Regions:
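N-terminal glycine-rich flavin-associated loop
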Residues: 8, 31-63, 85-128, 140, ...
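N-terminal flexible segment immediately upstream of the FAD-binding catalytic core
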Residues: 1-58, 68-100, 129, 152, ...
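Iron-sulfur-cluster electron-transfer modules
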Residues: 387-390, 604-727
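Long hydrophobic segments that form regular secondary structure
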Residues: 214, 222-242, 260, 266-283, ...
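C-terminal substrate-binding/cap subdomain adjacent to the FAD-binding core in PCMH-type
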Residues: 31, 139-141, 145, 149-375, ...
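Ferredoxin-type iron-sulfur electron-transfer modules and their immediate structural context
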Residues: 389-390, 465-470, 477-619, 638, ...
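Extended, hydrophobic alpha-helical segments in both membrane/secreted and soluble proteins
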Residues: 63-65, 72, 113, 262, ...
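A glycine-rich phosphate-binding loop feature that marks nucleotide/adenosyl-phosphate handling sites
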Residues: 22-25, 71-74, 130-137, 179, ...
Length: 727
């Protein structure tokens, strides 16, 4: 590993991280898995990427392309050299307003792209719930969808072309238009189109007919029925296993600024599922589910409580959020009226007299719509805010079926959960038959890992019975690739392997995903692996609301599910240090991961009190932004106190901390000797000389000491009325 780092340092300009702490921060994504990478490179250019690929081939190591690290299926963890595109490789290369298209680097965040497009009246509409931190490269690799796919389609429908490196180091343009193809690319294209023609009948028979299908490779893009065949669509959804993206051309859409929302209330979950197939006939741009568990949990989160109280009437078991957006805003009232009439026709009324209880809350205020959208986009994280060791686990969460089968499918899956002694939490995309459901399990327990396996087997059998997709949005990764034979058949698995072999014969790119996958329940790959435990540690604060060692300190740390909400770059206050550095070390998620690895002994002895841990916490300004905005309630400012207390107990209090902490004690003396105290700011070189001793940076002046204390009668304001403060 050290040898790999030494070689890379001579050949790349980007940042390299090979220490244990940094590698640990990239060992997890938002899935249940953990795999320690060999090292991390944040490339600054295509030259850096080309050099990294060359070195990887020479040294026999794998490459993992990573964006926001928000994968829920383990796509972005591997024992590989990780290339983090999000820090530097993230710009807009071209913007063609006339033809409504743009070309971007893979590391650009969706929200950042849409902020740049908004002044031009355009946007990229694959509006995933993680838009504040999801990168376009990651979305393309996953074939992401978003809540408005009913109108705008998926990533595959909105990616026009991709520039990418192949495993041999050659770079090519995948798309219908562009420079004349090289002979190597033409041969590859011809091979793939022959393959598509050969397997067209099998593909038609085996691929689910539902809109939401992201499992396996998009080899249906190669069949004669898909002409013109765009090989970029084969790369979309390939999870970084076929090529390394360097530029992605996107289709843009006009912004429909006016929209309205109808919040449909149902007394039972089954009623909502049955109604979805009828509501979509009104042509909304989205129908999203919120179940009673999510409503209850959201009420306990300060930032969502008022929204719930304003929107929810009575005690519904489920809500369907039906959104309309029209170029002609005068049609909105017509749409809402039609929605109310349909709910009545389906047999619902607010009174419940002679009909089932239910109705529509109309939301026309854009600010309230925005708050509801924030609540819905935080659905996963709200579900994860349970404080016990049992958490909603992602492994069958986005299966998709046809809308007429949705009610029966959800009822069947609920029976499976009950059979295994657990329950599911439901939310997301009712309009396309793709609901997110996570059974509550404790994956620290072997019995619950076995339960997870059994639920997965039975769930995918149920999906196959309804001819649905076992992966409707979140991809394959480590959690679902194993089941491709069950869902697609042995011949299709062989086809996927053939494509992988043609593009990447030596397995350079992200091995173990889509093809040649390990067992999904191999605990050696889990975040909570065999022997995972935290020894008892002394803590100074009350952590009794959580479980685990340190009086619950462990459980509070483990509340971080790696969703990455702290990586947002605009809006709110979380996380200020990350917004400046854009480094994983300086974001709440990175700090929480470091703490978890430290207290469980995965970073070596005394990791909690080490200098590397102090550096991890150094730029946390204790602003409590995470406490107020993290949907799972991670309070890094409070955790930092424990780290500082443990470090002080072991190493004593530093001079820097003493100078800050004891300021009130020595301030009167410094004031009297202000001419000496202020020398540090005025004498050339003195600030630099004292920097290492005091810990105060030489690049900034310290506050100037006054020889006249402000409480002195000479400087105090006179003749002011007395004030009484009631505290």
């Amino acid at each position: 590993m050290t040898h790999l780092a030494e070689i890379l340092r001579t050949r790349v300009q980007g940042d390299l991280l090979f220490d244990r702490f940094s590698r640990g921060r990239y060992a997890t994504d938002a899935s249940l898995y953990q795999m320690m990478p060999l090292g991390i490179l944040s490339p600054k250019s295509e030259d850096d990427i080309a050099a990294a690929l060359d070195v990887a081939r020479e040294q026999g190591v794998s490459i993992l392309s990573r964006g926001g690290g928000t994968s829920q299926c383990g796509q972005t963890v591997n024992e590989a050299l990780v290339l983090d595109n999000s820090q530097y490789f993230n710009g807009i290369l071209q913007l063609d307003l006339e033809n409504m298209r743009c070309v971007v680097r893979p590391g650009i965040v969706l929200d950042e792209l849409n902020r740049a497009l908004k002044p031009h009246g355009l946007w990229f509409p694959v509006d995933v719930s993680t838009a504040s931190r999801a990168t376009i490269g990651g979305m393309a690799g996953n074939n992401s969808c978003g809540g408005k796919s009913l109108r705008y389609g998926m990533m595959r429908d909105n990616v026009l072309s991709i520039d990418a490196f192949l495993a041999d180091g050659s770079k090519h343009h995948f798309g219908l238009n562009g420079p004349a193809p090289s002979p190597e690319y033409q041969t590859l294209s011809d091979d793939m189109l022959r393959f598509g023609a050969r397997e067209a009948q099998e593909i038609d028979a085996r691929f689910p007919k539902v809109m939401r299908r992201v499992g396996g490779y998009n080899i249906d893009a190669l069949t004669p029925g898909q002409t013109p065949n765009n090989l970029a669509h084969l790369l979309v959804g390939s999870e970084g296993t076929l090529a390394y993206y360097t530029a992605i051309e996107l289709k843009l859409w006009p912004i429909l600024s006016q929209k309205v929302l109808g919040v449909c209330h149902f007394a039972t979950f089954h009623q909502a599922m049955d109604a979805a197939q009828h509501l979509v006939t009104l042509h909304p741009q989205g129908v999203e589910l919120v179940d009673s568990t999510m409503i209850s949990l959201a009420r306990d989160i300060p930032m969502f409580r008022a929204t719930i109280e304003e929107v929810v009437t009575g005690k519904p078991e489920a809500l369907l959020l039906v959104e309309f957006a029209e170029e002609d805003a005068t049609l909105h009232s017509t749409r809402l009226k039609a929605l109310e009439e349909m709910m009545g026709d389906l047999g619902y009324s607010w009174s419940g007299i002679g009909k089932a209880w239910g109705g529509v809350t109309k939301v026309t205020d854009s600010a309230l719509q925005g708050r509801i959208a924030d609540l819905r986009s935080s659905g996963l994280n709200i579900m994860m805010s349970m404080k016990d060791d049992g958490k909603p686990v992602s492994f069958v969460e986005d299966c998709a079926v046809e809308l007429p089968d949705l009610a029966a499918y959800t009822a069947g899956l609920t029976e499976i959960f009950e059979k295994h002694g657990t329950r599911g939490t439901w939310y997301a995309h009712a309009s396309v038959g793709c609901l997110h459901v996570r059974p509550v399990l404790n994956l620290k327990l072997d019995k619950d890992v076995k339960t997870m396996r059994a639920i997965a087997e039975e769930c995918f059998d149920l999906v196959a019975r309804y001819k649905g997709s076992h992966s409707g949005e979140h991809g394959d990764g480590l959690v679902r690739s194993e089941f491709h034979e069950k869902m697609f058949g042995a011949r299709m698995v062989s086809n996927f392997a053939e494509v992988k072999k043609r593009f990447d014969p030596n397995g350079l790119f992200n091995p173990g995903k889509i093809v040649d996958a390990p067992k999904m329940d191999d605990r050696r790959l889990f975040r909570y692996g065999p022997g995972y435990a935290a020894p008892e540690i002394r803590t100074e604060l009350d952590w009794s609301a959580w479980t685990g060692s340190g009086g619950g300190f462990q459980g509070a740390i483990e509340m971080c599910n790696n969703n990455g909400a702290c990586r947002k770059l605009k809006g709110g206050v979380m996380c200020p240090s990350y917004r400046v550095t854009r480094k994983e070390q300086d974001v709440t998620r990175g700090r929480a991961n470091t703490l978890r690895l430290a207290i469980t002994g995965q970073l070596g002895p005394d990791a909690l009190t080490s200098e590397a841990m102090a550096e991890t916490m150094k730029l946390c300004v204790s602003c409590k932004g995470c406490k107020s905005e993290c949907p799972t309630g991670v309070d890094m400012a409070r955790m930092k106190i424990e780290v500082q207390a443990a470090r002080a107990q072991k190493h004593g209090i530093s001079l820097h901390d003493r100078l800050v902490g004891y300021l009130p004690r020595y301030a009167p003396w410094a004031s009297r000797l202000s001419f000496l105290a202020n020398l540090r700011n005025s004498v050339p070189g003195l600030a630099r000389l004292t920097e290492s001793l005091t810990g105060f940076t030489a690049t900034r002046n310290l506050p100037v000491w006054s020889a006249h204390p402000f409480r002195n009668d000479e400087v105090a304001q006179q003749d002011q009325p007395k004030a009484v403060i009631f505290a």
